[in-house]
From Swiss-Prot:
Gene label: Atosb
Protein known as: Atos homolog protein B
Compositionally biased residues, Low complexity: 130-148
Membership in a protein family: Belongs to the ATOS family.
Notes on the domains: The protein contains a transactivation domain (TAD) which may be required for transcriptional activation of a subset of target genes.
Region (Transactivation domain 1 (TAD1)), start-end ranges: 436-444
Gene Ontology CC: one annotated term: nucleus
Localization: Nucleus
Length: 538
């Protein structure tokens, strides 16, 4: 902390120095002691305190000029002066850093002393107190300061005791009294101490006219006017220095004191910085004009692996949304399970029988060697054919129950027309195992005499085990499926009927043996579609 103190001294002998010119009595009506303590070093904050002491109204002492030595905390050090300060003020380099004038109107440390304090915080001057009986005037009269240095380099005090007696009083030499509300100007270097941390010196104000000459408009410190920064504006509030902050940092405008810059919060997303920018300070002012990240535009002709992955991900997302729209009832409520439940695939809808016939279960293995003999009777008897059967077994049993086999007989080797049958008759399909033993013989009667040309339909023949005596009113839960035969029929444009596509069969691996002690018998059920019963060919 720097301390600038102005006080009224008692009647004592002045300390004459070799570089201080004599001051006659009555010349100075008040004094100002300017100085700072170097104990803080260059890293101490730029805070100043100006103390003005005045005695009670009845004390009258002849004015004397005193010179105060520097504090004894450090040895004398050489001050850095600006160009021309030493020659203009007449100070040798070995003088101490604290030089001032003391007004001898009594030492203001006794009883009845009124004081005023001024704290210079950065560039703001705050008056902390005042007294209606305090009186302090400046020294000699000089020319007024240039208007370019009056905005930030002045301290404004008010003399409450003496009225204006003509003329302007400045810190210099003038034989006249000071006016009321006089403007006391401090050295420019004194304010530089608050900005650069005590690197600028405090120069003594000596006798002579206008110790700070007016700077010319042409040059400043040897630089051309176009490279010289503009001076301060008219008197008024001192402008506060503000540094440029990136867009992600928030500027604290509630305090004018200089302090550490606010930290950037983690996770704050600011404007994207340009990688090729060489001016880091100018980046926040134009980087917000850059376009933000956009979703990649999918090119329908893009055949690269990345393009295919993007298209696949987009199709999967659209299909998931479509499934959610069509089947909201298939999803479990969110509160039913702590984990998200995926939507049930529509390919698994239906009963166990439909899932087996359509091949919606993953097969556990295949068995080769099964064959099937196909024959028909009716208005005519076509030739019997024997075709191989592709048998697949599954492992879907959860209670050690026998899982059925699925046999598929492909009719494509018989030609495009398939296996020709009469419109009314009986179809016989005999299944043989690899040992050429009969597994099951299916007999299905049909009547498609009303089937129009170029249409198709199917028949599904089932064999159930049901308790004896309950053939008519047996519930579906009390019957067991043993065998199933699925036949597909199609009529040509000429009206001829034939089997086409394939024939699918369901059968058990071993004979069903019930240990319930109740008699069971086989029950055959043949079903056909209705409403509509026939469908036109695609």
């Amino acid at each position: 902390m720097r301390h600038v103190q102005a006080e009224l001294s008692p009647s004592s002998e002045p300390e004459a120095g070799p570089s201080q010119p004599p001051v006659t009595q009555g010349t100075l009506q008040g004094g100002l002691l300017m100085g700072y303590s170097p104990a803080g070093g260059a890293t101490s904050p730029g805070v100043y305190q100006v103390s003005i002491f005045s005695p009670s109204a009845g004390v009258s002492e002849p004015p004397r000029a005193l010179k105060r030595p520097a504090p004894s905390t450090e040895g004398p050090r050489e001050l850095k002066r600006g160009p021309g300060l030493g020659a203009r003020e007449g100070l040798p380099p070995e003088e101490p850093s604290t030089v001032g004038l003391v007004s001898p109107e009594g030492l203001g440390l006794g009883l009845g002393v009124a004081s005023q304090h001024f704290s210079h915080h950065g560039l703001r001057v705050v008056e902390q107190g005042g007294s209606a009986t305090s009186s302090w005037t400046s020294g000699t009269q000089s020319t007024p300061w240039p208007s370019s240095n009056a905005s930030c380099n002045t301290l404004h005090t008010r003399d409450w005791a003496f009225p204006d007696q003509g003329g302007q009083g400045c810190l210099g030499e003038s034989p006249g009294p000071a006016p009321s509300g006089q403007l006391h100007t401090l050295d420019t270097d004194l304010h530089n101490l608050a900005q650069i941390g005590g690197k600028s010196p405090v120069a003594r104000v000596g006798n002579g006219s206008n110790p700070w000459p007016r700077e010319s408009h042409g040059t400043a410190n040897g630089h051309s006017p176009e490279h010289t920064p503009p001076g301060p504006g008219p008197p008024g509030p001192c402008p506060t220095k503000r540094r440029l902050l990136p867009a992600g940092e928030a500027l604290d405008v509630s305090s004018e004191d200089e302090g550490p810059a606010p930290r950037r919060r983690r996770g704050t997303l600011g404007c994207p910085l340009a990688a090729n920018s060489s001016d880091a300070k100018a980046t926040p002012f134009w980087s917000h004009l850059l376009p933000g990240p956009k979703e990649p535009v999918l090119d329908p002709t893009d055949r690269s692996p990345m393009g295919r992955r993007l298209k696949g991900a987009r199709r999967l997302k659209l299909s998931s949304l479509r499934t959610l729209r069509k089947g909201p009832g298939l999803l479990s409520p969110p509160s039913a399970s702590p984990f998200p439940t995926p939507a049930v695939s529509r390919t698994l809808l239906g009963n166990f029988e439909e899932s087996l016939l359509r091949g919606r279960f993953a097969p556990s293995g295949h068995i080769e060697g099964f064959t099937a003999e196909i024959g028909a009777s009716g208005s005519y008897c076509p030739q019997h054919v024997t075709l191989p059967v592709t048998v697949t077994f599954f492992d879907v049993s959860e209670q050690n129950a026998p899982a059925p086999f699925l046999g598929v007989v492909d009719l494509n080797p018989l030609g495009r027309k398939g296996y020709s049958v009469p419109k009314v008759g009986t179809i016989q399909v005999t299944l043989f195992n690899p040992n050429q033993t009969v597994v099951k013989m299916f007999l299905v009667t049909f009547d498609f005499s009303d089937m129009p040309a170029a249409h198709m339909t199917f028949l599904r023949h089932r064999l159930f085990l049901v308790p004896v005596g309950e053939e008519g009113n047996v519930s579906p839960t009390h019957r067991l499926l043993c065998y199933l035969l699925h036949l597909r029929f199609r009529s040509s444009r000429s009206g001829r009927l034939s089997l086409h596509g394939d024939i699918r069969l369901l059968f058990s691996r071993r004979s069903l043996e019930l240990d319930t002690g109740l008699p069971y018998e086989l029950q055959a059920v043949t079903e056909a579609p209705h409403n509509p019963r026939y469908s036109p060919l695609p």
